[in-house]
């Protein structure tokens, strides 16, 4: 592995909310403001670390749909709403589904460069209040992001159709996609039953109810039921509601410091950031980013895929995982070992920090050393973060 340039950056703490279904009537958080979700993980990550919140020099939050309740810099709003120090600034970033992972990566880079000593990388998304249709309605009123000039160069389509293109290019059968979905639910249910998520989850109270586990897991999911689902994006397609990620609500936060700062505060460094990357890829298929992101991380660190003990690849759509598996041939017993977004859910701007949080805790639980997170992102992007437990 390469030695990172600049100062060593360590993860001190990482937490997340239970992930709720993004359902207007049945979702955990149907009556919850996204500020409350993000604010909760801010308060908890500081409390668990046992530090004065004033030690945090900046907070970065990922969020995709930044308008309405999630507008006007939700990172700052959630921090202030919790009564945390006004001297700590905040900013909100959008790298589509990789937004929270990018928030963590940006924080790590700033610490490595010596700009700050302690930061929080985080993310939030309330898809129950902000379905994809909400963004389209806003564009209908205020103008469309994809101009004719852009579309002339890249005929951008929805992510579901991009997933179908990937399934076609890599000749992935529908049965393989459904098998990945069943695997995700089975592993997520097993992890929940065994209490694997308990340390990372912050219990969340709403209207007298306390939620401590993820809402979207369906332990009875089976191949027969999935095979009966209709294609979601084209009549003869392979991608369905069952082999794609769920519409979800949630938040996650990761507290990072320089190794020197953590030592000065008497804190245990739980992992260090070895490397990070972001890549661009075809903006039409758009979801193959984890393939080159993984290639780049491996090459730059002189590693093989088998050198990584645990991998979290976001299950935005099953074809993303299937194509990545074909290209990199990983041991799947090391991949998404506690399930993924098809079972747990995918609150867009939050998932990257959630994946890093889950990876950290699983490295500790299973006594493993090297972990990697990679995600596909809208617009043709891929993200990667390589960590080492210490």
Segments from the language model and where they lie:
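Condensing-enzyme catalytic core mediating Claisen C-C bond formation in acyl metabolism
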Residues: 2-32, 224-288, 292, 299, ...
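N-terminal extracellular/periplasmic Venus flytrap/periplasmic-binding protein-like
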Residues: 15-18, 30-40, 48, 176-264, ...
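Conserved catalytic cysteine-centered active-site region
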Residues: 32, 63-117, 153-159, 220-246, ...
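Active-site-proximal alpha-helical scaffold in enzymes
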Residues: 93-125, 167-197, 253-260, 326, ...
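Active-site pocket-lining segment
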Residues: 164, 200-202, 274-343
